[in-house]
Amino acid sequence: MTHVNNGEVMEKEMEPTGERERDRETAAGSGVHHRFLASASERDANSGNALEAAATKTKTGTTITNLEDLAFEACQNWSDLHQDFFITDDELEYEDELSLGSSIGGNIATTTTADAAVEGLITGEHQNEQLLMEVLCGNRVSQMTRAYDDIEAVTRLLEEKEKDLELTVQIGKELLTQNNALEARVADLETDLKASNDDRAQLVHELHKKNELISVLTNDADDGTDTDTPTMSKSITLDLLQRKVNSLLDENKSLKCEATQLAHQTDEVEEHERQLMADISAQLNDANSQYDNLSLELERQREENRLQHEQIVNLTARLAEAEMRLHQLTQDNDEHLSLLHVTKENQNALALELVEFKQRYEEVLALLHSAQDQLKQQRKRSQPQARSSFLGGLGTSGAGMGGSLFPPDSLHCELMESSLYSENSLDSGISGDSQRSADRISRMMMHMPSGGMSSSTMGGSVYAGAGNVPPYKRVFDTVRCAGKSGNYMDSGNVSMTQLGAMSMSSSSGPRMASMAYPAGSYYRGGSNQSLGVKTLSSESLNSQSDDGYPAQPSGVPGAPGAKELEAALKRLTPAEVLARRAMLSYAPAGTYNYDEPMGHGTGNVRNSDLPLGVRTPDSIMSTGSSGMSGSTNHMSASMTHQWRLPEKLQIIKPMEGSQTLHHWSRLATPTLSGLLDERPGVTIRGGRGLDDLGMQIYTLSDVEEDVSDDLPGKQFEAPGCTFTYTNSMVMHPDDGFVNDLSFLSQSQMSSRMASTSTSRQPSCPATPRAGLSRKNSCSTFSVNLGLAGMLNERGIKAVTPSALNTPAGPNFSPTVTPCNSPEGSPPRAQSPEPLFGLLSCGADLIRRKIVGDQHQQQQQKQRSSLSKQQQQKIMLSHLERRALRSLNLIEKVESIGLENIISAQRGLGSGIANRSSSPLSSGSLQSLHTSSNSIVDDIHFDRAQIKGVLHRGLKSPTPATASTSAAAAASGPGISTSSSTSAYNSDDSDDQGLVMKIKPSKSATPTTTGAAQSQPSSATTSNGTASETRLKQMQRQKSRRQLKNGMANQRPDLGTISGAGGGGRVRPDLGKVADSGSSSKLSTKRSEAKPAEEEEATPQTITQAFVGSVSSLLFGRKGGWL
């Protein structure tokens, strides 16, 4: 069996009908009808008709409703055809006999009878089949009728029908294949039959011709044997036919065997083909699955290829950009290298010049010191004459001077006249009327009790003809008239806050000096020296000169009535001072004059027997001016109704541009005040702001919870000063809380009111109000002194960095980025510490709160029972609070070893130590004088002790600290206590505050011990509850600042320095900053004093950031200290 295409099957379906028709025609032509062929042809026709009818019925869909019926009929017809088509041997022999009989004997009638029998058999079979189909159809209809009522049975039947249908389709396909094969075989056999029939006809014809020939031959040869010839021919023909039949039988058998063998081979081939088809289908399925997988992989590879292409394009663009930037940066690097080379060359040249200038500066400074020493000696020699009689000396020497010493039209005469005898100025202003000034001077000279001196002599010798000088020749009057229109115009409120929370402001009107006129010149100076005009420049403020800081006078020898003066001062009350000021402010013009005594008819004889020019501490002219009365029996601190600023400096043309440039240069100069103050619009290159450093700004105008804001002198700024003298006034806590604004004119009042909201308010140092008594507690401070004058007045010794030597070694560089130090190079020279004065001030403030002075101790002893009930609250002034905050910052600096950055030089210590204090600061609690031999070694800070004292609420300090502090407090002006703060421990880095532990020198040990033993036992007691409250408030404020600022990290622009616990991080351009365990020089003495506290301190990031700012101040490009 072979597989054929369905198309070929459909094409060959109609071929058997045509072939059968042709066979019938051929058989009809020959006149022979075979039994097998007739029945087969009829069955073929019937099957063909049945197939055509079935196909027609299937197409129309009228009779057959199921494909199963069609398949059943087709199978039945094809099975019948297959059975009837089989040819047996008997049939073949019968056909041969019929053919042989027809050839020999003609047409035989048996063929007709055989065909009738076959047709009857076929009709009976068809009737049986039709009957069977009717029975099956009836059974099927009955089954379908019963099954329609059961849905499950219908479902099962449908499933069975589906399975039967599939089986029927498969069987139909196989049958169609077999039918096609059989049809092909039938066609071949018919062809063979035709050929055999032709051969047989040809043979019959030949046989007939031969028989005729034989008969002719026989007839011609043997005429007499006519009776025997037919018999012989018959016998010959029979033998031939018999042999032919035998051969055909043998051939038939061989063909059957061959057909059987071919059928077996065909089955084997078909089985092999089925196996091949199964294998091919399996391989095709595998190939399809592999194709799908490869398609997915190919899609994924395409997506990856697309992404890689995009990345390649992006990277190519970036590479091109990077190459361009590399080229640009290479060019910039070359330019920067060339600029760096040039900068290094300039830096080296500038360093050499700086070293040369430093050497010259040292020489000049040495000459200045020698000149100052000589000047001091000269003043001491002339001191007794100034004490005995100030103007009397003038009178005695007046005859010798004649009229040539002071020309009447000279500027010197006008300056002397305005500074000594002005009636309309605060300290040394210009008089309003020259003629009235001359008259007043003559009246004063007449009242002076100098025996041989007269007004005519004084007027003729010293100020001869002063009143006769024409007005147009007087310089001050001309300048006054020229500058009267713009005298009080506001030229910009420029404030610069100096260290210590004292403010300076440039105000309207003439500029006043930032430094007070030396008060000692009125006590010690001679007649010619004290009358001279002294001008202090900015260079003299930076020098270590005693000219601006005169020594404290030991009493007033030669001045009669000193004891009475002291008694009068003790009896003076704040109410009287306020009343006197009010009278002087609002009295009519001419009411109070210098030529009229104060106490005519009133019996007021206080302040009598004082020399002319001697000032009292409570006088309004105590620090900057000298008021003189009309006689030696009366001393007046009053002035006339109107206080006006001096107008001396109007001889200089005002230059606003110069003032602006001076202000800019002052802002650009880095100072430590920049760390504590916020200056809007001004930044330090490489520095960081207060927020980055973890600090907050507290101004003097901030109202804190335990400080009242009703203190006097805080609402208005004092008049600004430039280059000459200083206005000053005494502010005492017991003077009440009334704002005295009488010293301001109307225009100044309006300008001050307008600038109050934008400028910082200077404040006088407020002390705790222990009582209304002012015994031994009066100290005079200037309101608007400069930084140097303020520090000197408070007993603080400070040296400006410009006056100190800077290292000039090979590894020193003055620029902002010095050269790197080579390996093995010696360490750079150390500079003196600029924070020495501030530390001493802070130590004084702590000492005031812990120990207290003798007067407060006496009051606490008297009111010990009352203090237990009332719990008096401790008050800190703004200056003290500012100093404590400054000390906290300084403590962070010294915890990482500030002494290694700017350490004190032994050679310059003597200059700082030999500087004397102001006479105004001798009675204050801050007068801790430094000695020349113990500036570094006599004092250090013991944080452990002070921390314990602060935690105990300032109740009971340790015995050593208490005794030393008590001794220092009781030492007074006569005892010199060593309190230098240039060396202190940095092992403990806590932020609770600084504690000063005084190490008394050997020479001062007996004195301090005796003083400490003389103090009462209750001298160091204080209010514990208030102290603890204050301590907790300070700690809370500190913790809030730390949390808010987040402990700022290191400065990336200034590099990193070694902390207290680390090592190895070195900035080569700033030198090495050693930690607490690596400093050898300073740790030697500390290890002797504190051997148990030599452990490493933890690093602090705030400290590192602060040191970064300090380094920018020290090594900054624009005016750094070093």
UniProtKB/Swiss-Prot annotation:
Question: In what residue span(s) does the HAP1 N-terminal domain sit?
Answer: 87-382
Q: What GO MF annotations does this protein's record show?
A: myosin binding; protein-macromolecule adaptor activity
Write the record's keywords in alphabetical order, separated by commas.
Coiled coil, Mitochondrion, Phosphoprotein
Specify residue ranges for compositional bias: Low complexity.
750-760, 854-871, 956-983, 1007-1022
Main localisation: mitochondrion
Region annotation (Involved in interaction with OGT) ranges: 456-756
| Other observations noted | Was named 'Milton' after the blind British poet.
Q: Which PANTHER family match?
A: TRAFFICKING KINESIN-BINDING PROTEIN, TRAFFICKING KINESIN-BINDING PROTEIN MILT
Q: Family per UniProt?
A: Belongs to the milton family.
List the protein's name: Trafficking kinesin-binding protein milt
| Species per Swiss-Prot/TrEMBL record | Drosophila melanogaster
